[in-house]
């Protein structure tokens, strides 16, 4: 059962099949996992994916991690994630929220969240909770869209005119995160799928304008990757 306090994520909640196609199209060149493996390697370590949805990223972590835990509050997505990793004995999917992870203190090495919960101001309780479950020397990684970069950011700002990119980045900086921008490319197999994906991410008018502006089957999308490490020892001023 989904906790009634959970804030819906309308795209993946209502159109999981289209969102799966979106996941398959995103970062087709693998730039984000390439960066993450260099910045926060998880070989032989314990990884938690907060807001894992249908578990799309769990197998990637499972290839090298000793244990992977997907945390997802929405029951239908949780069931889909569990089905996806059914053959992986060291992967489990559990119910939970970013603000109340069902894990012991200092029990994991990497907490990962991609376009989930950690959107800026208001994410403080989740950051505190992540630091609780992280072992000393572990890392919290937040991956989100860079709304300042064209063309995807232009479409987002059209639908979210009050979104303040600078304020969001300042929030994470104040919380002790280091920021890296990662350029990626989304590529689709056909224009129908591309239009469907744009249709679940934007208003009808913005999605139509975006589709008209794309001559082919791909476009650039930049991400922000915020990393905060938990000190391995006493943190001196």
What are these regions (language model features)?
Residues 1-43, 56-60, 139-170, 201:
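Conserved class I S-adenosyl-L-methionine
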Residues 45, 66, 109:
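Conserved acidic residues
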Residues 48, 53-100:
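Class I SAM-dependent methyltransferase SAM/SAH-binding core
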Residues 54, 173, 178-237:
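Conserved Class I S-adenosyl-L-methionine
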Residues 99-111:
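A short acidic, Gly/Pro-enriched loop at the edge of an enzyme's catalytic core
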Residues 109-123:
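A short SAM/SAH-binding and catalytic strip from SAM-dependent methyltransferases
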Residues 124-136:
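A short glycine-rich, Lys/Arg-flanked "PGG" loop and its adjoining helix->strand segment in the class I
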């Amino acid at each position: 059962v989904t906790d009634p306090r959970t804030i819906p994520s309308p795209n993946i909640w209502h159109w999981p099949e289209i969102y799966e196609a979106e996941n398959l199209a995103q970062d087709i060149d693998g730039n984000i996992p390439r960066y993450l493996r260099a910045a926060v390697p998880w070989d032989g370590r314990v990884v938690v994916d907060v807001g894992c949805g249908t578990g799309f990223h769990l197998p990637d972590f499972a290839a090298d991690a000793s244990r992977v835990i997907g945390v997802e509050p929405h029951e239908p997505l949780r069931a889909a994630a569990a089905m996806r990793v059914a053959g992986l004995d060291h992967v489990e999917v559990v119910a939970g929220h970013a603000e109340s992870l069902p894990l012991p203190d200092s029990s994991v090495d990497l907490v990962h969240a991609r376009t989930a919960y950690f959107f800026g101001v208001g994410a403080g309780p989740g950051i505190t909770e992540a630091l609780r479950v992280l072992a000393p020397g572990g890392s919290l990684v937040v991956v989100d869209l860079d709304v300042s970069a064209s063309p995807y950011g232009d479409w987002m700002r059209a639908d979210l005119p009050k979104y303040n990119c600078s304020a969001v980045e300042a929030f994470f900086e104040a919380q002790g995160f280091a920021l890296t921008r990662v350029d990626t490319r989304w590529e689709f197999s056909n224009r129908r799928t591309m239009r469907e994906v744009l249709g679940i991410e934007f208003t009808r008018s913005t999605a139509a304008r975006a589709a008209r502006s794309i001559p082919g089957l791909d476009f650039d999308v930049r991400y922000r990757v915020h990393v905060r490490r938990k000190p391995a020892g006493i943190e001196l001023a």
